[in-house]
Amino acid sequence: MVAIRKEQSLSGVSSEIKKRAKRNTLSSLPQETQPLRKVRIIVNDPYATDDSSSDEEELKVPKPRKMKRIVREINFPSMEVSEQPSESSSQDSTKTDGKIAVSASPAVPRKKPVGVRQRKWGKWAAEIRDPIKKTRTWLGTFDTLEEAAKAYDAKKLEFDAIVAGNVSTTKRDVSSSETSQCSRSSPVVPVEQDDTSASALTCVNNPDDVSTVAPTAPTPNVPAGGNKETLFDFDFTNLQIPDFGFLAEEQQDLDFDCFLADDQFDDFGLLDDIQGFEDNGPSALPDFDFADVEDLQLADSSFGFLDQLAPINISCPLKSFAAS
């Protein structure tokens, strides 16, 4: 009897659990069939017991303690990532597919032009090196790469024009100075001319440093030993030569001793007045009166110490050495 009751109780519990599970599944089923996520919850209740009978208590049969298990299933709709609607219409589907295929290919990095660099905040800065001042010149900040590249190219063309102008002017100055120096220092070379040939070629300095050849009017050939009148338009035979024969006469020579005459240097006194130079003998000194010294009273003051000299009481070392 006890075993039958146990089987009935277990069958009743299992049937009740199945009914509840069916109810939950039926109630949780959506009206429309869609993929769902099922969550199953299993709980074991150790304090839940079956109904006990007096017969079991009387028999006192030991039995293991039973635990009640509760199972619950909950269905959730699956969470799908909603796709953002494309801006293009269905007609542009083929175009978008082509764009996707192109973008999928590896992009080739574009080379930045010279003098342009990008800032951290996205702007494009341009600068160029000044070839004249040897410094960097700031061109500014631009929104796009193309604007910065255009500014760099324009400034570069400007600098190239300035440098080309300076080079041409320096070359022109150097060439003009060389040509002028050559025209000054180069000797004149005679050129043999014919009646049919042109005259000597002359170099004309142009501002563009281009030597041009200008022909001059031909001149007739002059034969050797020709007439002098044709060249100089003057007859030297008619030139009168002065007569210098008066220089050969007496006392007509150029007398330069007059410049050293004695009367010209009387104030300076020549050596003729000094005695003793012609005979190489002594000359008499002029008399000098020393009476003026007494008037100056030098005998009593300046030279008086000569009469007032103290006696020299110094023992002679030679006598003492001889005595010893």
UniProtKB/Swiss-Prot annotation:
Main localization (coarse): nucleus
Compositional bias segments (type: Low complexity): 77-93
GO MF annotation list: DNA-binding transcription factor activity; transcription cis-regulatory region binding
Residue ranges flagged as DNA-binding region: 112-170
Gene3D superfamilies cross-referenced by the UniProt entry: AP2/ERF domain (3.30.730.10)
Annotated compartments: Nucleus
GO CC terms in record: nucleus
Disordered: annotated segments: 1-120
Disulfide bond annotation, renumbered to this chain: none
Swiss-Prot/TrEMBL keywords: Activator, DNA-binding, Ethylene signaling pathway, Nucleus, Transcription, Transcription regulation
Biased composition (Polar residues): 24-34
Biased composition (Basic residues): 109-120
GO biological process, alphabetically ordered: ethylene-activated signaling pathway
Family assignment from sequence similarity: Belongs to the AP2/ERF transcription factor family. ERF subfamily.
Function in brief: Probably acts as a transcriptional activator. Binds to the GCC-box pathogenesis-related promoter element. May be involved in the regulation of gene expression by stress factors and by components of stress signal transduction pathways.
Descriptive protein name: Ethylene-responsive transcription factor ERF118
Annotated organism of origin: Arabidopsis thaliana (Mouse-ear cress)
